[in-house]
């Protein structure tokens, strides 16, 4: 196996794991990093989905007791049924729009410059949302994931649709959207984690069936390396983020998004790099 390809797979796996659950857009970072590393062949998008699967496995492991409890309680426990219903409701809008506009989005927006614009716009939205949070005098309306109503779930699901634009961030859209709709910061973060499970599992299955030719003997090793790197880095990131949101807001991520987006634009328009 080519050592350069191994290094690229590991780098992209770590990038995915560190950015999947932060409000900075993992897809945007993978597009920029893949272009910079010249890792953007016909199977690159399949590789990206595979390593996203590695990141979601980290969430499944972190919340394994909760997931087992919900699954085992589905036949008889109302709280498990309500939680599952909320996840399904919140997942439907993004899946529906994604299936309708997938080809157009990938053709028009899956390149570094559109991603950079989305990073900057998303950063500005986070700054605005955090300013609104500071102006609020009343406490959040929803203080537990189990207290979410189907309407709350639908609102978060609609917010998740913004993440179809690469660079906007799925976690950023759901967490910030949830906070604006009255969810406590930690509740919005945890619900965002759970929403990622069906979305990314579905995307992995879809891409696997659609591009099964990519899973050759040579590519399986690279996919496995990227998946493991994404799993480990995502596991560390999830645990860190849960501690972080207990005492901090997302302003630092907003400024990072804006700075990174402007840097990508500067590099592209200055001719220093020819973004693919």
UniProtKB/Swiss-Prot annotation:
Gene Ontology molecular function: any one: undecaprenyl-diphosphatase activity
A Pfam short name: BacA
Keywords annotated in UniProt: Antibiotic resistance, Cell inner membrane, Cell membrane, Cell shape, Cell wall biogenesis/degradation, Hydrolase, Membrane, Peptidoglycan synthesis, Transmembrane, Transmembrane helix
GO cellular component: a single term: plasma membrane
Domain of life: Bacteria
TM helices/strands, residue ranges: 83-103, 108-128, 187-207, 217-237, 252-272
GO BP term, pick one: response to antibiotic
Keyword Phosphoprotein carried by entry: no
Membrane topology: Multi-pass membrane protein
InterPro entries, alphabetized: UppP
Enzyme category, top tier: hydrolase
Catalytic activity entry: di-trans,octa-cis-undecaprenyl diphosphate + H2O = di-trans,octa-cis-undecaprenyl phosphate + phosphate + H(+)
SS bonds (residue pairs): none
Subcellular location: Cell inner membrane
EC number of this enzyme: 3.6.1.27
Family: Belongs to the UppP family.
More details: Bacitracin is thought to be involved in the inhibition of peptidoglycan synthesis by sequestering undecaprenyl diphosphate, thereby reducing the pool of lipid carrier available.
Functional summary from the UniProt entry: Catalyzes the dephosphorylation of undecaprenyl diphosphate (UPP). Confers resistance to bacitracin.
Annotated protein name in UniProt: Undecaprenyl-diphosphatase 1
Originating species: Burkholderia cenocepacia (strain HI2424)
Gene for this chain: uppP1
């Amino acid at each position: 196996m080519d050592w350069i390809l191994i290094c690229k797979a590991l780098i992209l796996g770590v990038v995915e794991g560190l950015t999947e659950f932060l409000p900075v857009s993992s897809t945007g970072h993978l597009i920029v990093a893949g272009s910079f590393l010249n890792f953007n062949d016909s199977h690159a998008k399949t590789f990206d989905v595979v390593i996203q699967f590695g990141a979601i496995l980290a969430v499944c492991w972190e919340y394994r007791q909760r997931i087992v409890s919900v699954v085992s309680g589905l036949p008889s426990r109302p709280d498990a049924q309500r939680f599952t219903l909320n996840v399904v409701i919140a997942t439907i809008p993004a899946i529906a729009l994604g299936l309708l506009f997938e080809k157009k989005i990938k053709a028009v927006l899956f390149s570094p410059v559109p991603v950079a614009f989305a990073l900057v716009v998303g950063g500005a939205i986070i700054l605005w949302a955090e300013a609104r949070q500071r102006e609020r005098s009343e406490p959040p309306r929803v203080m537990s994931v189990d207290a979410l109503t189907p309407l709350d779930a639908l609102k978060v699901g609609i917010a998740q649709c913004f993440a179809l634009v690469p660079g906007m961030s799925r976690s950023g859209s759901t967490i910030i959207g949830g906070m604006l709709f009255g969810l406590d910061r930690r509740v919005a973060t945890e619900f965002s984690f759970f929403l990622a499970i069906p979305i990314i599992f579905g995307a992995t299955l879809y891409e696997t069936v659609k591009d099964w030719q990519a899973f050759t003997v040579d590519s399986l090793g690279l996919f496995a390396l990227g998946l493991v790197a994404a799993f480990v880095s995502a596991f560390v990131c999830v645990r860190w983020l849960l501690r972080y949101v207990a005492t901090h807001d997302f302003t630092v991520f907003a400024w990072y998004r804006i700075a990174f987006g402007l840097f990508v634009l500067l590099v592209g328009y200055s001719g220093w790099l020819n973004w693919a």
